[in-house]
Amino acid sequence: MTRTKDEKGMEGLKGQIQKGKGVDIGTMFVKCAHKEGDEIVFKSQRNAFFEVEHTDFTKKILDNSKVKYIIKEDNLYVVGDEALQFANMFNKDTRRPLSKGVISPTEKEALPMIELLIKSVVGEPAHKGEIVYFSVPGEPLDAEFNVLYHIKMVEGFLKTLGYTPKPINEGHAIILSELAEEDFTGIGLSFGGGMVNVCLSFMSV
């Protein structure tokens, strides 16, 4: 049986620790971390966008300045850190693709914006199928919405980029990061811009 190139590549990874990446998709920021040698490298983008006038001149200026933007129909949207700069300059508010920790159901432009923001921080996978864990909030106690839609959309964005996405509760992620000496038993608290997440764990469960 002939093995494919991808199968041979993955076979070479067996017995090694697959480092992968971690992505925190928050209401305020989208952040990514991965390891290069002994160093952990972080990339961050503000989770926001701002609509500007769509003209050829504006597009040329943004291209020359390497500003991230999306053109949709007749509209041009600046995303990330630069969106806040534009909003401050025009004394207006930015718009956010997330609300209460999940993709906003009332923001019609949320999906293309969060997709571009995720792409800008995770980049290309080191190999096809590289694992990336992404944070998700728990089910809310004071609202009636399901996080499943949010999870499936983010999974789809990451799969399109060539990753193998795996969701992880953000409170649980803190426990796995900080409580190894306590056998991953304790309480993890995550204070975000849209929600506060609490996770109680006993021996990592």
Predicted regions located by residue number:
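Nucleotide/phosphate-binding catalytic cleft detector across ATP-hydrolyzing
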Residues: 1-191, 203-205
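Coil-to-beta-strand transition motifs
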Residues: 193-195
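Short, acidic (Asp/Glu-rich) active-site segment that either coordinates a divalent metal cofactor
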Residues: 197-200
